[in-house]
Each structure stands twice: as structure tokens, then as C-alpha cells.
């Protein structure tokens, strides 16, 4: 059973949570920190416990970074395919952590991997979400040259999610990198066009344009802040909200 946590009514019925692969590293320099997996599983379980349907996309940067190898001469398509496989590995690890917490979960891959994951099917994904399972979308869009941010926005639109929640290391979008610039100011709210015009680097151009064209709200928040994810889902004002003006 998913953990029962709050009597507050959720603001969102269905969300798409985007985690970076680097987030799974925790304090490690590479790979997956089991403690981080367990903490994330607990926070996701809190959402399931109040009836929120959760779709999940995880990057692969903790296991493989194709851009560096591409710059060194590796074929870009080959590198992107390797990156897709890294996201599948992260998805399997997250499914295991969720199931150990008695939270039902399903991994779907945009690349067919019979016997390892289910192949991505929109209608099947929505049936499992309606049944209370966490659905983990892996292997990006299945196409090279598309980021996992683009995959997250695409899947959110396909499954008719209410919002995309992008978990980062900082509590929102700033005028500059707050780790490098102490005078950086945080935005409470932005429009898609402001993100594009200011070149804020929240997500890649394709992802932002997808959200803008389909009017999909996007909230950027700090996943390392305890309770932030639950607070957003019940209507709290964590991070930065990006939506149509």
C-alpha cells in the first residue's frame, strides 16, 4: 500500500515528474545512490497515497553522457542510443525502489526491450495510471537528437497530464546560476516566451515549444527540499511556474 500522508486535496490529478540522471547520484560521482532512490520512492509514494497519478521520466547523465563522446568523434546517433539505454537502467532501478516500498510501478520503453520492459503504448500507460501505478517512461522519445526533457514534455502531453514538474538542484529559475552569482534573482512565474527570449536554459528549445504550443504548465523546483513535491501537488508555491501569459 502507498503511504497515506495528507488530508489535503491534491491540486493535480495526474503529473509528469522529470528527474535528471544526476539527481540519482546523490553524493557519488557516478552511478546510482540507493539512499536517493529510496527517498525519491518515498516522496512519490506520498503522492500516490493521496490519489495522484504519477508519470516519471528520468535522464541518463549519471551513467552516460553522449555529448562528450560525440565531441570526441563518436557517431551522434550511436551516442544517443547509448544514452537511451542509460535511462532504461535508471527506470529499472526506480521501479525496484518503488516496489520495495509497496508502490506498484511499470517501466515502459520507447525502444522495444522484450522481457525487460513493456514497450511504450499510450493507451496502456493511461490504463495503468488510472489503476494507481507509477508509470516510468524510459528511452526518451526513441529517436536520436531529442533530449529527455523533450521526452518528458511529449509524454506529459500524450497522457494528458495536468503539469510537468522538473526537479533540479535549485529551487526554481534564476536570472543567473545562483551557485556562481550571489546576486542572481529567482523568478516566481514566467511565460514560455520569456524563457525563450531570456535564454534561461530551463529546458531545450524543443521541450519549451512543445509545452507552449500545447499549453502545458511547467514548474521547476528543488527535489532535494524535503516535502517540496507534495507541497506543489497540494497547491503550494514551490519553485518557478512557467505557463502561458
From Swiss-Prot:
Organism: Pseudomonas paraeruginosa (strain DSM 24068 / PA7) (Pseudomonas aeruginosa (strain PA7))
Domain of life: Bacteria
Record-level GO cellular component terms: cytosol
Name of the top EC class for this enzyme: transferase
GO BP terms, alphabetized: 'de novo' CTP biosynthetic process; UDP biosynthetic process
Molecular function terms from GO: ATP binding; UMP kinase activity
Name listed for the protein in its UniProt record: Uridylate kinase
Cross-referenced InterPro entries: AceGlu_kinase-like_sf, Asp/Glu/Uridylate_kinase, Uridylate_kinase, Uridylate_kinase_bac
Subcellular location: Cytoplasm
NCBIfam families found in the cross-reference section: pyrH_bact (TIGR02075)
Biological or metabolic pathway of the protein: Pyrimidine metabolism; CTP biosynthesis via de novo pathway; UDP from UMP (UMPK route): step 1/1
